[in-house]
Amino acid sequence: MEHIQFEGADHDITGSTYGASLPVDTALSPKRDVIVAYEMNGVPIPRDHGFPVRLVAPGVVGARNVKWLNKIVASKEESLSHWQRNDYKGFSPSVDWDTVDFKSAPAIQDLPVTSAICEPAEGAVISAEDEEITLKGYAWSGGGKGIVRVDVSLDGGKTWHVADLKGENKLNRAWAWKLWHATLPLPKGADSLQICVKAVDSTYNTQPDSVAPIWNLRGVLSNAWHRVNVKVKRE
């Protein structure tokens, strides 16, 4: 037994049901906290979230978290579902729809480290009279890996500052977002800022500076630096 297959009750126009699978080491490990859930916030799971039961596999790509769960199978092979075998896989930027071979790549399971800026928003206008700017956001990494550092920049990545992390800094079984914030002095004379963020997880994985080297035809695994452009208003 190498895989645990999960099949949902929903189906597409061909009649094929949605399915996915997890490696047995993920599905059955007590350190991965995989569950079959029937309640959400103390009440039965809502229909749109998978009533009556669904799989919850924290740290794993959402495509494996099967809703409306109807069948579980222990198997030597992964799910035969289209969405396991022929979707949600990453490829080189050189691969296009004419050359792609989905059998050549493994199905996405744990996701890469990522982060985002929530405040300020793209296009925001801040006053130079404030003399400082406060940034807020979140960071997260797949597989339960904790976030050990978040770096932020006000000049497009030329110089960096370490953000403050909120709450307990768990290095393993870290399933939730790690919130971060930073209050920084405004660069003198600047009339615009390009704010960037990148995170580092507990195995020292970090993020690429642009999408170019990780672009893929399916648009998955996109974890380049998040950038936000803001204006500085001077009286």
What feature does the model see in each segment?
Residues 1-235:
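Extended, aromatic/histidine-rich regions of cofactor-dependent oxidoreductases associated
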